[in-house]
Amino acid sequence: MNTNPTPISFEDSERYTFDKVPNESRVKIYGVQYILIADETGNEFYVTREGWRLRDNLHAENWYNDQRFAKEGERLVEGTGHVYRMPTTNRHGNQTDLVVKFSRFAEAVPLHVAKTFPDKMPADVGSAEFNDPFQEFGLLVDLRNGRFGPAEIQIKTKHPVAIFSPAARVAPWRLGRAKGRFERHRREIDNHSDEAFAKIDFDYERQYIYLFAWVKGENAADYMKEGKLGEKETRALTKRVESELKQKGFKVLDHKPSHIILREDSHGELLRHDGELVYALVDFELLMRTEEYEDYLRARNEKL
């Protein structure tokens, strides 16, 4: 199947479970399936399996229209990107906090990308490119599945809910996309789309916005500033997370404490398991597989 997907409405989506939506409204990119929902204004929502139960919260009027995410949401400090925490309430009164993050794919990566801990910047940063939305979700789902590396290591992350593309066009110069980079992402999304499903193409004049489920807690950098986490332990935690990511076949080029979320227990102490801090990761614009994992995947595919 090579046709464009046929979107369904939010109303029609109520008739289906995720697996029962017809294939003509479904795409599979980088190994992840999405259902395309469009509203009456032409806004598009590529909803993941994990996001399907939250789709009633995704209506644009709940968080996007009139820039509600900026006026009512909390601006999060994540490098130079635009990221917001936005509480939403659906028509049934169910509340869900979403993370709203504007994709920067095909833009230049800021030169000040660097790690707070450890001190050495990876060589990959010099040629780094932001993942496109489907690429990032694909890598994130792969990381969450944890099929590579030690089974006892499971990396917790925020849940990928949907990729939102507003109907309104935006002048390319305002988006800051380089045409050459954008065309490479177009080719990559075509190459990594499953032929059994409909296929999509990126639009040069449309925005793409990530929607994640909010991860409760506070980042390690803030805990360090508050004095609840010492600099030595913050440094050790950051190196431990980097090591565990590598063992699971991944690396994040701008890895830093502000991307590591910690929680407190009922006594107000940082949550630990067997003496080690329990953490979850956020921010995956520069997530990539290690060479070892890429080699493993190539060898596996050659056997198929």
Task: Kindly give the residue locations of the regions a language model identified.
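Regulatory N- and C-terminal appendages and interdomain linkers associated
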Residues: 1-78, 82-98, 105-113, 272, ...
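Conserved ATP-binding subdomain of kinase catalytic cores across diverse folds
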Residues: 54-209
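Residue-level detector of short, conserved catalytic/binding motifs and their immediate flanks
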Residues: 81-84, 98, 158, 210, ...
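Short, well-ordered beta-strand micro-motif
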Residues: 85-87, 211-216, 280-283
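Short catalytic/ligand-binding loop motif for oxyanion handling, primarily in non-cytosolic enzymes
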Residues: 107-110, 167-172, 219-221, 261-264, ...
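Glycine-rich, phosphate-binding/catalytic loops in enzymes
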Residues: 116-117, 228-230, 297-300
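Conserved kinase catalytic-core helix
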Residues: 143, 147-150, 182-197, 201-266
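Catalytic activation segment of kinase domains across protein kinase-like and atypical kinase folds
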Residues: 197, 251-304
